[in-house]
């Protein structure tokens, strides 16, 4: 990436306008001290709709959550339920949960998505 935000820069408070964003947020839930995954999902949705950016998220597939229904199912254009479990540390430690790739965008990426079919099951949620 040409530009990235760490905890120090507080990516949630930055304007992402004009960017293509990859977001792999903390998987934790919101606390009084720290934003949670739902805050990042809301930010990606908002930036896509208000600033016309493309945001690609890699997050746990939590289809039962409010943010999944209110933001992802309601506003994302594409979602991929990743095949298998992501593996970390040279494949020795698979994630204890399924993952999904969520794309918030105003653009059409149908052809590019076809080339990523080996990652899992892709769904186009809206035109």
Model-assigned labels for residue ranges:
Residues 1-127:
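Class I S-adenosyl-L-methionine-dependent methyltransferase catalytic core
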